[in-house]
Amino acid sequence: MKETIRIIGIDPGLLRTGWGIVESLGNSLHFIGSGTVTSNAEMDLASRLCQLHEGLSKVLHEFMPHEAAVEHTFVNKDATATLKLGQARGIALLAPAQAGLPVAEYAPNAVKKAVIGVGHGEKQQIHMMVKVLMPRASFDTSDAADALAIAICHAHHRQSIVSARRMQALLAG
């Protein structure tokens, strides 16, 4: 028997952290919600991280996902910016883990491959395919669209794992 799994995808960023929630039932995906949690750029780093944590925690409490997926961040030439992005990513991992969710991580090229079929592509291609895969999807920022793509990637990945386990069980007899 198939079960519906609610997945939150999170696209971490210090100024804007995108989130997108989908429900996966077998091979079908349904859009549940998306949005962006922001931090005030004029505040100190610790306060900004608290804003992100509080915002993500509210989303998790409101939508009650079963699993989370977070995108790996890329290394920037600016070491300070990379470190700050890493700290925001830490919040993106912490909030769902504190809520008791299993958290998966995906490289940006894995997300692109799952959504557009190739590991390299433009943001517009990703956003267009998110709308093709889920016509009712809406997103207020590119960060929210990217978060939906991360959730879609996780749904496809976990479906492959479930199928492989079923095949192993059948072969084992």
Curated annotation (Swiss-Prot):
Main location: cytoplasm
GO MF annotation, one: DNA binding
One GO BP: DNA repair
Reactions the enzyme catalyzes: Endonucleolytic cleavage at a junction such as a reciprocal single-stranded crossover between two homologous DNA duplexes (Holliday junction)
GO CC terms of this entry: cytoplasm; Holliday junction resolvase complex
Active-site residues (renumbered): D11, E71, D143
Family matches, as PROSITE patterns: RUVC
Cofactor: Mg(2+)
Keyword Transferase: no
Bound cofactor: record note: Binds 2 Mg(2+) ion per subunit.
Enzyme Commission number(s) from the entry: 3.1.21.10
Protein task: The RuvA-RuvB-RuvC complex processes Holliday junction (HJ) DNA during genetic recombination and DNA repair. Endonuclease that resolves HJ intermediates. Cleaves cruciform DNA by making single-stranded nicks across the HJ at symmetrical positions within the homologous arms, yielding a 5'-phosphate and a 3'-hydroxyl group; requires a central core of homology in the junction. The consensus cleavage sequence is 5'-(A/T)TT(C/G)-3'. Cleavage occurs on the 3'-side of the TT dinucleotide at the point of strand exchange.
Oligomeric form and interacting partners: Homodimer which binds Holliday junction (HJ) DNA. The HJ becomes 2-fold symmetrical on binding to RuvC with unstacked arms; it has a different conformation from HJ DNA in complex with RuvA. In the full resolvosome a probable DNA-RuvA(4)-RuvB(12)-RuvC(2) complex forms which resolves the HJ.
Protein name: Crossover junction endodeoxyribonuclease RuvC
